[in-house]
A protein has these predicted regions:
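Noncatalytic scaffold domains of N-terminal-nucleophile
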Residues: 68-88, 92, 100-267, 272-274, ...
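Bacterial N-terminal signal peptides
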Residues: 55-63
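Extended C-terminal subregions enriched in glycine
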Residues: 492-494, 527, 536-583
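Internal maturation/activation junctions in enzymes
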Residues: 342-451
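Short, small/polar residue-rich loop motifs at catalytic or cofactor-binding pockets
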Residues: 307, 430-433, 497-499
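Double-stranded beta-helix
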Residues: 3-34
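Active-site rim segments in enzyme catalytic domains, especially the processed small/beta chain
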Residues: 113-117, 124-139, 291-296, 444-507, ...
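Bacterial N-terminal signal peptides that target proteins for export
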Residues: 41-56
């Protein structure tokens, strides 16, 4: 089976909806579904579409450049991605009658080509999908898995101490079993309307004809040049013949990726998980010079996508739904919003010192619980419902002092967690990844966060795509002070993630918002900030995205350089915060659904673009 039976849904607060377990009519598996209570249902039609006009598509794709924009409005459909070329592919698919899942396939594969440092078929993804006809929210786990031969000491040196982070990243050691392609295939088979091969063809064509290297991609290559030169295949793709990094505007072709996609277009994921692509992936990982890995053909053949129940919680009159474990996103955001709901935020400015202090303290408190409890719940017994228990969050909110930094913040003891004997984990999760949001003409919605973990992943390249370094999202130490760490590496386990694809519903149960971001562990405060901007202060989605970023995942409060947040430094230090002013490059993409149409926003910190009709 491609999908396995999910665990019990997590749904806290006074959320209005129905939870049922039923047999899916498209496959032999059990599924738990969440249905918001709707006053009106939107029917999803199955439409017959003509073949894409590829020549005109490719011409328009090659001409697009990144331009900062205000919020975009549309009445029928909308797509917001991190790259203008990917947005155009999604737009063209929707324009021709394809649905949100069809557009998702086209967008992800194009991102693999034009934003290779952030995501691709060599990595993993989380998808939150709203099926308008069925009035269902589903979440799909395409997260990478640890090789079956990997052990908890994978990132320990001979003396038992953890290796330096990038010593673990670069090479085959860090590569987990990729899940993104399987996720695309499974969801397209269940929900897609256009032919699979038709969705892949635009990326094949552009890979063969060549695309212009964007400013951000060129900058990323330059900044990581030393590591990218480690392996010949990667070096030959990202550098000119004289050894200099590819500059902005270079016409870059990727015939190897085009050939890979032609196989996938014709045969689906079979060659990737069982055939010649699988063999090349394993060979690349196991023969990585200086740092070989454990990934095997058995790992690829045994990979499956898991359809999990979404984690939903209330904020004001809205219901916020996100991805559950192994993602820590929905739980940690839910904790932050739950604690902040006990303060009179309406009386505060979203950019003022008081709110910024409260937000940072809630951020830190939530991360204390995240570090102790959150991991792959198929391997670690988690107090999932207890972490979002309203009374528990009310109690935790009382630890926040509005006039100074609270002393001695530590993990709490949520209901059902009294017998947990674990050690906290403060693993690094560096910024990378990509996010996109799609709403189609039938009202279906996709919120998908996708990654190869660190920028350029393991730096290993095969058949035109990069392989992930997802295993470094596990704790490098399996235990601390004699106690096991929840997010320790175990064979077949999925590493904890901060990816937070989110869907929001209004008090009538109607879809209101799709949002998410890249950014490593700072994804969580980035998305929380944006949700508060829209849901608390009634901001336009673009205004909420544009708000200065603030994060306090650990002991230091980060303020976004080059924004008004810099002016908070003295005030925050007077309250007792240790402050760092630094770039906080989120990549938020969001769509808000209103009675009069769609409003989209893309993060000006990257190259995002919203398109719609």
């Amino acid at each position: 089976m491609l999908l396995v039976e999910p665990k019990e849904v997590v749904n806290i607060g006074d959320a209005e909806g129905e939870l049922t377990a039923e047999n899916d009519d498209r496959g032999n598996y059990q599924r738990s579904v969440f249905r918001p209570i709707l006053q009106q249902n939107t029917n999803r039609g199955i439409m017959l579409i003509n073949r894409l006009l590829l020549s005109s598509i490719i011409a328009s794709l090659m001409a697009i450049s990144a331009i900062a924009q205000d919020s975009k409005k549309a009445s029928k459909f909308m797509v917001a991605t991190a790259n203008p070329v990917a947005s155009k592919v999604g737009y063209d698919i929707l324009k021709r009658g394809g649905n949100a899942i069809d557009a998702m396939v086209g967008v992800q594969l194009m991102l693999n080509l034009v934003e290779p440092q952030s995501s691709g078929i060599g990595g993993g993804a989380f998808l939150l999908f709203y099926d308008a006809e069925r009035n269902e929210v589903s979440s799909f786990d395409g997260r990478e898995t640890a090789p079956l031969k990997a052990k908890g000491d994978l990132f320990l040196k001979e003396d038992g101490s953890p290796m330096k982070f990038f010593d673990g990243v670069v090479g085959g050691r860090s590569v987990g079993t990729p899940g993104t392609l399987k996720l695309l295939e499974v969801t397209h088979k269940n929900y897609g309307s256009l032919p699979w091969e038709e969705l892949i063809e635009p990326t094949i064509q552009l890979a063969e004809k060549g695309f212009r290297v964007s400013k951000r991609m060129a900058s990323s290559v330059e900044q990581d040049a030393e590591r990218l030169k480690t392996f010949p295949a990667t070096k030959s793709y990202f550098f000119l013949n004289d050894g200099t990094p590819i500059p902005e505007g270079t016409l870059l072709r990727n015939p190897d990726f085009a050939q890979t996609l032609r196989l996938i277009a014709a045969q689906g994921s079979e060659p990737f998980y069982y055939g010649e692509i699988a063999r090349d992936i394993v060979r690349t990982v196991q023969e990585a010079k200086g740092n070989p890995g454990k990934l095997s053909l058995a790992d690829l053949r045994n990979y499956w996508v898991i359809e999990r129940p979404p984690v939903c919680h209330d904020y004001k009159q809205f219901q916020v739904c996100g991805m559950g474990p192994p993602s820590s996103g929905a739980l940690t955001i839910g904790q932050m919003l739950g604690m902040l709901s006990h303060f009179e935020l309406d009386k505060l400015s979203p950019t003022g010192p008081t709110f910024s202090h409260l937000f940072a303290e809630a951020n830190l408190l939530a991360f204390k619980d995240r570090g102790l409890y959150m991991a792959d719940s198929d391997y670690v017994d988690m107090p999932t419902k207890g972490l979002l228990n309203p009374q528990y969050l009310k109690m935790r909110s009382k630890l926040i002092n509005s006039s100074k930094v609270s002393d001695g913040m530590s993990p709490g003891v949520p209901p059902t967690a009294s017998n947990y004997q674990l050690s906290p984990d403060a693993s690094m999760e560096l910024p990378s990844t990509s996010h996109f949001a799609i709403v189609d003409a039938q009202g279906n919605a996709v919120s998908m966060t996708t990654t190869i973990e660190n920028g350029f992943g393991s730096r290993l390249m095969t058949r035109g795509f990069l392989l992930n370094n997802e295993l470094t999202d596990f704790s490098f130490r399996p235990e601390q002070d004699g106690q096991l760490i929840a997010n320790r590496l175990e064979p077949g386990k999925r590493p904890r993630s901060s990816m937070s694809p989110t869907l929001v519903f209004n008090s009538s149960g109607q879809l209101h918002m799709a949002v998410g971001s890249p950014g490593g562990s700072r994804i969580i405060p980035y998305v929380a900030k944006t949700l508060l901007g829209v849901l608390q202060w009634n901001m336009d989605i673009q205004e909420a995205i544009n708000l200065p970023n603030i994060a306090k995942n650990f002991s230091t409060m980060d303020l976004e350089a080059g924004t008004s947040a810099e002016q908070l430094k003295v005030d925050m230090e007077q309250l007792g915060h240790k402050v760092s002013v630094r770039p906080l490059t989120s990549g938020l993409q969001g769509i808000v659904i209103t009675p009069t149409g769609l409003i989209g926003g893309a993060d000006p910190r990257r190259e995002g673009l919203v398109l719609g009709d």
